[in-house]
Amino acid sequence: MMSRKSVIQRNLKRISICDRLKSKREKLRAIIKDQSISMNDRFLAQVKLSKLPRDSSYIRIRNRCLITGRPRGCYRKFKVSRIVLRQLGSIGQIPGLTKSSW
């Protein structure tokens, strides 16, 4: 069973926003952590960081299967769920993946 298309699209939108604002977020975070910068400047950086969209944080991205959109049991290396991995592996669609036997 596939996830709703809106849920998959929402996650893809979060990925694109995160990629777009990653450098800005990292710079602000570095300013906040730097003790040599004045407290006022660090506070302003904290305010700017909090005004960035919530979805620009990588924490909000869910690791989903590319084929079914399944949120759990998803292998990062192949970007598919365990169920799809087994199906594709059994018909030889994933290079280098062989059925184990001993």
UniProtKB/Swiss-Prot annotation:
The entry's keywords: Ribonucleoprotein, Ribosomal protein, RNA-binding, rRNA-binding
Keyword set includes Metal-binding: no
GO BP annotation list: translation
Pfam families noted in UniProt: Ribosomal_S14
GO MF annotation list: rRNA binding; structural constituent of ribosome
A GO term from the CC aspect: cytoplasm
Family recorded in the similarity comment: Belongs to the universal ribosomal protein uS14 family.
Its job: Binds 16S rRNA, required for the assembly of 30S particles and may also be responsible for determining the conformation of the 16S rRNA at the A site.
Subunit structure: Part of the 30S ribosomal subunit. Contacts proteins S3 and S10.
Name this protein carries in UniProt: Small ribosomal subunit protein uS14
Source species of the chain: Ehrlichia ruminantium (strain Gardel)
Lineage, opening ranks: Bacteria, Pseudomonadati, Pseudomonadota, Alphaproteobacteria, Rickettsiales
Gene from which this protein is expressed: rpsN
